[in-house]
Amino acid sequence: FEEKYYPAVKEMVYRTRLSNGLTVALLPKKEFKEVYGSVTIQFGSVDTLVTEVDGDVKSYPAGIAHFLEHKLFERKDSSDLLSAFTSLGADSNAFTSFTKTSYLFSATDHFLENLELLDELVTSAHFTEDSILREQDIIQQEREMYQDDPDSCLFFSTLANLYPSTPLATDIVGSEESISQINLTNLQENFTRFYKPVNMSLFLVGNFDVERVQDYFERKELKVLDVQEVVREKFVLQDVQQTDSMRMDVSSPKLAIGIRGNREVADAECYRHNILLKLLFAMMFGWTSDRFQKLYES
């Protein structure tokens, strides 16, 4: 493991890339009682258009990344991995964003056993047609819940107006139509394409011994490195829809203002760019700003 010290926060991070392509980062904190682990896959709701090896572009239903996140908790014997984590005294969860899917656990005991479950979660998939149909009903109910949330509707509608006719114009969970189009074949294809170590990263933080983790990976049988790159299609941007409105049952009107950037940001600059935007918007529209007070009072 390569060591890197961050003097500003007085933390030492250990980082390596395994022979199978998985990136591993460790942040030991002896003063913690728990260990927190997360594995992140570079696969989110916007990844619905991919370029095949032969150059053809293949399209998948919106919401497939989120659907796959749900299904991976199901084991071959129809039991679920959430219960397996619970039996070890751990909490487990997962979430899908526009660009990533993350699976996580927190535990005070059985650290390596929980790490094994996390590995199982992202390296094996067991789908059946019947279980997919059941999951469609569950996710449709989740989608309807978001549709009843004014803040969620406001956010996603604003995003859709900024990026019309792109994957960003659809909710992360998908639409009623796209959820019903998700099937066994396209779930298997996306699992094979995106869920490979070279497209994943593991982060562990908490009360653990670095040498013990290193020994765990040295003894573990790793898959062969798959270096085939996932080629994503770039968005074709349309004109911004400048104004829009909707009616919902709320106690007072809500307002959202969206600004679409006009340039690409390098990967290495994304984090800094994000912080700068948050600071800018907090000054312009934060609840302590003059602009916020004027909008609120009007």
Where are the regions that the model predicts?
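Charge-rich, well-structured scaffold segments of protease-associated domains
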Residues: 17, 28, 80-229, 261, ...
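His/Glu-rich zincin catalytic helix
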Residues: 1-80, 188-292
